């Protein structure tokens, strides 16, 4: 299991600085949240590559800043906008292929959108197939304010797209959607390719690992059932932790919980 941290946790710190802060704290596995299109080229990309190489980091995934644009652009009814965003995402795939990142996180259309399901599936499939050419998997994330917050919608994606759909399961987003994450894992099964993890309790849905009451032992048990051996990325909001050191501690805590759970499962 590759356990790490997302640079999104350090927002609004610039992406390369966020990556450096994690690297300095011994975090080896990361998700890079790209906050500007110019971070995929020029000196920023050079610096990202330098940090990755110098610290021996493993970039598991990328998350685009343009998620809020996906409703209007990727899934909208104006072809030029669709082509524009697909072209931008193609650049992500190129960079991901260069640095070895395998999963591209997609939010998709918001709940209030009137995007027909047929169009949604067609556009997702197009992006999925394009990414595959670069060795990248486009994975639909469950987001509380998006169509993917609905278990029914996720079931429809699986039913209509078959083996050409994959998913990111985010624990805090499941809490915010009032969806049991264990039920979600059971429904999606081996099509889960990425996890965003956080702790939580009745008072807060996003806490550092070990600061809430979430049953991580059960999580590992459920993941064992679907033979999940991929990434587990800590993703917290800046107001939910006290220091950058706490992010590294979260990753280490997850590793300890996993080690204990794995021993019991075996």
What are these regions (language model features)?
Residues 18-35:
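Catalytic domains of carbohydrate-active enzymes, especially glycoside hydrolases
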Residues 8-15, 33-44, 111-116, 144-149, ...:
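Acidic-and-aromatic substrate-binding clefts and catalytic sites of carbohydrate-active enzymes
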Residues 19-24, 43-63, 93-99, 128-133, ...:
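Acidic (Asp/Glu)-rich catalytic clusters
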Residues 263-266:
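Conserved small/polar residues in nucleotide/adenosyl-binding loops
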Residues 22, 30, 52, 96, ...:
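Conserved, mostly hydrophobic/aromatic
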Residues 16, 54, 71-166:
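Active-site acidic/histidine proton-transfer and metal-coordination neighborhood
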Residues 29-30, 62, 126-213:
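Acidic/histidine-rich catalytic cores of soluble enzymes
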Residues 11-22, 84-93, 180-184:
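Short, acidic/polar
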């Amino acid at each position: 299991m590759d356990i790490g941290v997302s640079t999104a946790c350090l927002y609004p710190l610039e992406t390369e600085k966020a990556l450096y802060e994690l690297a300095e704290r011994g975090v080896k596995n990361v998700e890079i949240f790209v906050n500007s299109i110019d971070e995929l080229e020029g000196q920023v990309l050079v610096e990202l590559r330098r940090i990755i190489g110098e610290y021996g980091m493993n970039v598991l995934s990328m998350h685009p800043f343009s998620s809020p644009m996906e409703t209007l652009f990727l899934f909208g009814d104006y072809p030029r906008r669709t082509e524009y965003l697909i072209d931008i995402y193609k650049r992500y795939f190129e960079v991901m292929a260069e640095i070895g990142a395998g999963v591209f996180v997609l939010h998709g259309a918001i709940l209030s959108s009137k995007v027909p399901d047929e169009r949604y599936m067609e556009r997702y499939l197009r992006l999925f197939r394009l990414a595959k050419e670069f060795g990248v998997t486009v994975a639909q994330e469950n987001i509380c304010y998006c169509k993917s917050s609905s278990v029914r919608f996720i079931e429809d994606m699986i039913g209509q797209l078959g083996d050409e759909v994959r998913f990111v399961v985010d624990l805090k987003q499941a809490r915010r959607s009032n969806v049991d994450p264990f039920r979600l894992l059971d429904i999606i099964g081996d099509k889960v390719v990425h996890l965003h993890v956080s702790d939580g309790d009745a008072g807060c849905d996003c806490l550092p690992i070990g600061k809430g009451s979430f049953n991580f032992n059960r999580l590992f048990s459920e993941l064992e059932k679907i033979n999940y051996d991929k990434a587990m990325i800590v993703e917290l909001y800046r107001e939910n932790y006290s220091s950058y050191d706490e992010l590294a501690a979260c990753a280490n805590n997850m590793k300890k919980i996993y080690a204990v759970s794995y021993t019991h499962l075996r």
